[in-house]
């Protein structure tokens, strides 16, 4: 243990013994130990926190003969410090003073009231408003993976059982958990990205029987058959470990966790981890949030809708009934001009989902409740807007919102219009709500009038015009006079405090009043706290319908955002059909188009049973990758319920989206660029089906030309001929354009460019057939490659082209896929005779004789040829 760690506690002060006892219960996390207006940290905790938070590390006297390292943060600013710690993957135990200092003979009684971890945040100040904060747990039971996830700030609880390590990696990439609980005896798959929030838990926390007992107790059921979870032992083991962890950290009931959802792999389009990154759904390839699909689609007006949109984006559905209901709702919002009215009403909605979670945990603040009150007051207007809407989904959501008149009335009676931030100082409960509180407040408030009267009376009685009556928390009420006038005070004044320039006194009458008033104020604050806790308990007992309201409001916001985007960006409703194929008319890349100042060049796509693969050639920067990605994004958008950037889109069933676009070294995993590329390619070849959409860009470029071309050819041939996946295959290997001759399901298309002098113009239009050239040197010039290098490259290119032409004329190295060239034919008799003659030496007579001789030789060869052709025909007929 480090030198700053405490030794045996028997030699410590009583307060430090208390600290060490509590710290021993939480050895692996930071302990915030409440002392007055500060949370203090000691020993190793202090050293770690000082480094992480950049706060002062000092010492607090000695205990057991050694100085005590100490650091602290003020209570009023604790949330900002907690936020910084959890972002760095730290967990913190909050230890509060729960005893009364005035009645404590030893150290004030303290206990840990909650544990803040990266995955269990619920406080508004600690959460990203538009991002879900997920706690996940991973188990392996009977050789099957189980993954459970919980968003504590909403109560959303689910489990799944990934089929293999690739599916597990895809699910973790989708969930992006802030904290992952793992059996400490479990060895994680190599290369699995788990982030900084990895928490190891004892193996017995993942036992199936324990998990089942915990879950049935939480939901008040005999078994878990009603959730469809009874056959998912690995998932249940993870869910049980997760629930136990949340109970330990929150130390309260969890009434907002009401159901467990089982997610099946075939319910959604599978997008593996690499493909999710390549498509830049929420994060771009640099790790930022700009220029992503979410940044274009998210025009939601409240945080609940934004988080729901992102959940949909990360898990596109395959259920056409659900998707068509969403498409119809978006269409009706546009057609009936409901979009703006609905968005205007939703704009003032509070984050009810998270407010209800804090209500359930007993941590809701007064302004949470006024936010809930204002939201409930808007529900009748929302329902009126959607009354008679021509989309069943909109009607259902309006009904799901409800109106909750009793809850609204309760909140209106209980709370003042503008309450303070916290309940601690009172002023939250409205006048008239509770007679006892009103009586105590009246007594307390009348004190002000009494004090003014006392001050005026004492000034007149003593003749001291500057005499004041005041109050502070330490010394209570006092009469204050300047030191120069202290000799004039009456004998019954009892000195209470001496300050620079003033003296403070107390009177028996003022002391009696102080006892009475302070007692009333303390009782009023205590009564108000009790009433507030009763209000929270009342709301918590009826959470289910309010949670349904929150879910409906979030979906309405998301659908209205889809409608707004469709109107603003000229999107169209996609058709989802049973038959195979993908047909997109005048499709555009949603993110690139949104970022351009000028118009985007649209392109068509047709893939069906007869045409399964496009071999895409063309220059760098010509738009090959953009074209491929736009097909994937249009497909994905259609499967979350959004309209799509195209004149029309008709899409058959899609089960997976794969992308093999770009690559870089995996230094941490010890994998080269080519190894990363081949690993991703192998995943596609093992898992793609006839309903998968596959994007392959520049396969084989990470190795030698012949190796790369061979791999690219074999990969494309397998996808087109055997797996028959919908494939867009971009390549710079011109030899690949010969593939359609051998695979009828493949076709060539290209993106062209034109040259104007030294300039190159990319047309970005997809055209039939292969490209004529790659324009690599022109692109290098655009990139700023120095002129001398370009000139040297041109000279080398000319030399290579001349060598290639010579080899075509005199082939001595075969093309990789060409048939062996036949041997050169022997010279004919006429050619042999002609080669032996010098024309300059012939007389006219000799020349005429030679002509007749050549004619005879030629006639004989023609006869031989005719005889050979006749023999061949006879052989075939036999």
Curated annotation (Swiss-Prot):
Gene Ontology, cellular component aspect: cytosol
Gene3D superfamilies attached to this UniProt entry: 1.10.1420.10, 6.10.140.430, DNA repair protein MutS, domain I, MutS, connector domain, P-loop containing nucleotide triphosphate hydrolases
SMART domains: MUTSac, MUTSd
Basic and acidic residues compositional bias, start-end: 800-811, 863-878
Alphabetized UniProt keyword annotations: ATP-binding, DNA damage, DNA repair, DNA-binding, Nucleotide-binding
SUPFAM superfamilies for the chain: DNA repair protein MutS, domain I, DNA repair protein MutS, domain II, DNA repair protein MutS, domain III, P-loop containing nucleoside triphosphate hydrolases
Any one biological process term the GO annotation gives: mismatch repair
Record InterPro entries: DNA_mismatch_repair_MutS (IPR005748), DNA_mismatch_repair_MutS-lik_N (IPR007695), DNA_mismatch_repair_MutS/MSH (IPR017261), DNA_mismatch_repair_MutS_C (IPR000432), DNA_mismatch_repair_MutS_clamp (IPR007861), DNA_mismatch_repair_MutS_core (IPR007696), DNA_mismatch_repair_MutS_N (IPR016151), DNA_mismatch_repair_MutS_sf (IPR036187)
Keyword ATP-binding on entry: yes
Protein family per UniProt: Belongs to the DNA mismatch repair MutS family.
Record-linked NCBIfam families: mutS1, PRK05399.1
Protein name: DNA mismatch repair protein MutS
Organism name: Alkalilimnicola ehrlichii (strain ATCC BAA-1101 / DSM 17681 / MLHE-1)
């Amino acid at each position: 243990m480090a030198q700053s760690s405490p030794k045996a506690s028997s030699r410590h002060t009583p307060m430090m013994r208390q600290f060490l006892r509590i710290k021993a219960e939480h050895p692996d996390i930071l302990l915030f130990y409440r002392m007055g207006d500060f949370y203090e940290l000691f020993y190793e905790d202090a050293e770690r926190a000082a480094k992480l938070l950049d706060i002062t590390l000092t010492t607090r006297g000695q205990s057991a003969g050694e100085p005590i390292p100490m650091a602290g943060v003020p209570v009023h600013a604790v949330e900002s410090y907690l936020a910084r710690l959890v972002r760095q993957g730290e967990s913190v135990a909050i230890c509060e003073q729960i005893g009364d200092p005035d009645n404590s003979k030893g150290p004030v009684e303290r206990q840990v009231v909650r544990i803040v971890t990266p995955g269990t945040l619920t406080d508004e100040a600690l959460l990203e408003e538009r991002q879900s904060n997920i706690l996940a747990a991973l188990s392996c039971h009977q050789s099957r993976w189980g993954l459970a996830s919980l968003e504590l700030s909403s109560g959303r609880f689910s489990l799944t059982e990934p089929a293999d390590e690739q599916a597990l990696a895809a699910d973790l990439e989708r969930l992006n958990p802030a904290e992952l609980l793992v059996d400490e005896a479990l060895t994680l798959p190599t290369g699995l990205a788990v982030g900084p929030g990895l928490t190891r838990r004892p193996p017995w926390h993942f036992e199936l029987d324990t998990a089942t007992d915990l879950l049935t107790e939480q939901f008040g059921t005999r078994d878990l058959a009603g959730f469809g979870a009874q056959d998912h032992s690995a998932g249940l083991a993870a869910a049980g470990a997760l629930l136990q962890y949340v109970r330990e950290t929150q130390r309260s009931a969890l009434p907002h966790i009401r159901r467990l959802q089982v997610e099946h792999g075939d319910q959604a389009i599978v997008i593996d981890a690499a493909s999710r990154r390549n498509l830049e759904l929420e994060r771009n390839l640099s790790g930022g949030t700009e220029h992503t699909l979410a940044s274009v689609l998210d025009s939601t007006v409240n945080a609940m809708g934004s988080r729901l949109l992102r959940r949909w984006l990360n898990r596109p559905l395959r259920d056409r009934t659900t998707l068509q209901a969403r498409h119809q709702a978006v269409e009706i919002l546009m057609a009936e001009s409901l979009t703006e009215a609905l968005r205007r009403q939703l704009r003032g909605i509070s984050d009810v989902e998270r407010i209800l979670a804090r209500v359930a945990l007993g941590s809701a603040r007064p302004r949470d409740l006024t936010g809930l009150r204002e939201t409930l007051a808007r529900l009748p207007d929302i329902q009126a807007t959607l009354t008679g809407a021509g989309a069943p989904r909109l009607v259902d959501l309006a009904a799901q919102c409800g109106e909750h008149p009793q809850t609204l009335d309760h909140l209106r009676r209980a709370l003042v219009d503008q309450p303070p931030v916290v309940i601690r100082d009172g002023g939250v409960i409205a006048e008239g709500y509770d007679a006892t509180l009103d009586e105590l407040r009246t007594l307390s408030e009348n004190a002000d009038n009494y004090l003014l009267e006392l001050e005026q009376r004492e000034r007149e009685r003593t003749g001291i015009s500057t005499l004041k009556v005041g109050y502070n928390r330490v010394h209570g009420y006092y009469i204050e006079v300047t030191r120069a006038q202290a000799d004039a005070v009456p004998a019954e004044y009892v000195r209470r405090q001496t300050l620079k320039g003033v003296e403070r006194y107390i009177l028996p009458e003022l002391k009696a009043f102080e006892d009475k008033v302070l007692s009333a104020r303390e009782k009023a604050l205590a009564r108000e706290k009790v009433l507030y806790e009763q209000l929270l308990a009342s709301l918590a007992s009826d959470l289910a319908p309010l949670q349904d309201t929150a879910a409906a409001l979030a979906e309405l916001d998301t659908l209205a955002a889809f409608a707004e985007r469709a109107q603003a960006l000229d999107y169209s409703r996609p058709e989802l059909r049973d038959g195979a194929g993908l047909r997109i008319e005048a499709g555009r890349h949603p993110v690139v188009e949104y970022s351009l100042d000028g118009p985007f060049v649209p392109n068509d796509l047709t893939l069906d049973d007869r045409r399964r693969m496009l071999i895409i050639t063309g220059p760098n920067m010509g738009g090959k990758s953009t074209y491929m990605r736009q097909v994937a994004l249009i497909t994905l958008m259609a499967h979350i319920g959004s309209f799509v950037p195209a004149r029309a889109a008709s899409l058959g069933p899609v089960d997976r989206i794969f992308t093999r676009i770009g690559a870089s070294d995996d230094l941490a995993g010890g994998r080269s660029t080519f190894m990363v590329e081949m690993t991703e390619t192998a995943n596609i070849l093992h898992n793609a089906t006839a309903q998968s959409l596959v994007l392959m860009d520049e396969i084989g470029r990470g190795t030698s030309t012949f190796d790369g071309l061979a791999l690219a050819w074999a990969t494309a041939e397998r996808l087109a001929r055997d797996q028959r996946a919908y494939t867009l295959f971009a390549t710079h290997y011109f030899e690949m354009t010969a593939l359609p001759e051998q695979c009828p399901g493949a076709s060539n298309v290209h993106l062209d460019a034109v040259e104007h002098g030294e300039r190159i113009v990319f047309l970005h239009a997809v055209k039939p057939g292969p490209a004529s050239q790659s324009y690599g040197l022109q692109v290098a010039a655009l990139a700023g490659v120095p002129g001398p290098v370009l000139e040297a490259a041109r000279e080398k290119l000319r030399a290579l082209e001349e060598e290639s032409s010579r080899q075509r004329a005199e082939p001595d190295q075969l093309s990789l896929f060409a048939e062996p060239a036949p041997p050169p034919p022997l010279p004919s008799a006429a050619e042999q005779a002609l080669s032996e003659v010098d024309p300059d030496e012939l007389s006219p007579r000799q020349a005429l004789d030679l002509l007749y001789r050549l004619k005879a030789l030629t006639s004989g060869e023609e006869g031989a040829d005719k005889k050979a052709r006749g023999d061949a025909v006879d052989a075939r007929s036999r």
